[in-house]
Amino acid sequence: MANKTVLFNKHLESNAKMVDFHGWDMPLNYGSQIEEHHAVRQDAGMFDVSHMTVVDVTGTDACAFLRKLLANDVAKLKVPGKALYGGMLDDNAGIIDDLITYYLTDTFYRVVVNSATREKDLAWIAKQSQGFDVTVTERPELAMIAVQGPNAKAKAAAVFSSEQNAAIEGMKPFFGKQAGSLFIATTGYTGEAGYEIIVPETEAEALWQALLDQGVKPCGLGARDTLRLEAGMNLYGLDMDETINPLAANMGWTIAWEPTDRDFIGRKALEALRDAGTDKLVGLVMEEKGVLRHDMPVFFTDAAGVEQQGVITSGTFSPTLGYSIAMARVPSSIGDTAEVEMRKKRVAVRVVAPNFVRNGKQAF
């Protein structure tokens, strides 16, 4: 029996095509994935992300616990509401999950983890919390709606109360604030401005309808995937998992190496990998016909004249750019060009930073 979010009936009202997503009945699209994608790049779209898992970590050791649990350092968060992104690693520096952590008070942090990894994440967090004075509380009574796009904030403002708008006025990117019954965060998975709104399940349908009434277009998993790939954002299970370390997943920037005495889980293994050198995640662009896809092999000749091989982790046609893009894990000796094997022939591709579109425009 698949799980259903509290917005399931709203999706059916908008003629969503529903699919199974890691045990959840979720909308793939509402008729046109391309139109939904363009709505987010050009206007405003919204996603039901209530399948994501909200976990509150409270207690006198909350900071110390999260400094051990995460490769990024929550001690950097000094202003209430500030958030950071990073990996939760195992002892071998494999990525158990990537997640966002909000600092609310010295004894209260909110962590948002992926739905596909929920059970193993909760088990790992519970296991590692032993010996710390913390309480770990899953919040299944909370739903979440992401509103994204150049007009998303303005359209959301028409739905928020005057008190809520006052509370979030001038809020910088990667912040979250409790405003009335809503937890409103300037985060997202699209490369556009907007909000991720954590809302009590009892109020979620009304919020979704109010946003719909403001002309915010419902968007499904299809558009969510093409948008995040254009933005160069990893998808857990495709671009990284427990067999991949953050240095090989374009997540090196999320590792807080300083202070050197912070012994986060996976640190020793990660230091050894850093010193030895790892593969890296790059962007690929193919302007001729065809679509780059997950698992296609990537070839290039290094400076020493030796053929090297990597693999595409995520690939798609980019609706914004009009040609195919991909992320690929390759040896770090790669240059500016490579070849991808598709339909039993090799096709030339450009190698770029894994960040293709930001705020509606080409980013490379």
Swiss-Prot record:
Keywords: Aminotransferase, Transferase
GO terms, molecular function: aminomethyltransferase activity; transaminase activity
EC number: 2.1.2.10
Segments crossing the lipid bilayer: none
Classification via NCBIfam families: gcvT, PRK00389.1
SUPFAM superfamilies: Aminomethyltransferase beta-barrel domain, Folate-binding domain
Keyword hit for Signal: no
GO cellular component, one term: glycine cleavage complex
Enzyme category, top tier: transferase
Function noted in UniProt: The glycine cleavage system catalyzes the degradation of glycine.
Gene Ontology biological process: glycine decarboxylation via glycine cleavage system
Superkingdom of source: Bacteria
Subunit structure, as described in the record: The glycine cleavage system is composed of four proteins: P, T, L and H.
Record field: catalytic activity: N(6)-[(R)-S(8)-aminomethyldihydrolipoyl]-L-lysyl-[protein] + (6S)-5,6,7,8-tetrahydrofolate = N(6)-[(R)-dihydrolipoyl]-L-lysyl-[protein] + (6R)-5,10-methylene-5,6,7,8-tetrahydrofolate + NH4(+)
Family the entry assigns: Belongs to the GcvT family.
KW Transferase (keyword) present: yes
Protein name: Aminomethyltransferase
InterPro entries (alphabetical): GCS_T (IPR006223), GCS_T_bac (IPR022903), GCST_C (IPR013977), GCV_T_N (IPR006222), GcvT/YgfZ/DmdA (IPR028896), GcvT/YgfZ_C (IPR029043), TrmE/GcvT_dom1 (IPR027266)
Gene that specifies this protein: gcvT
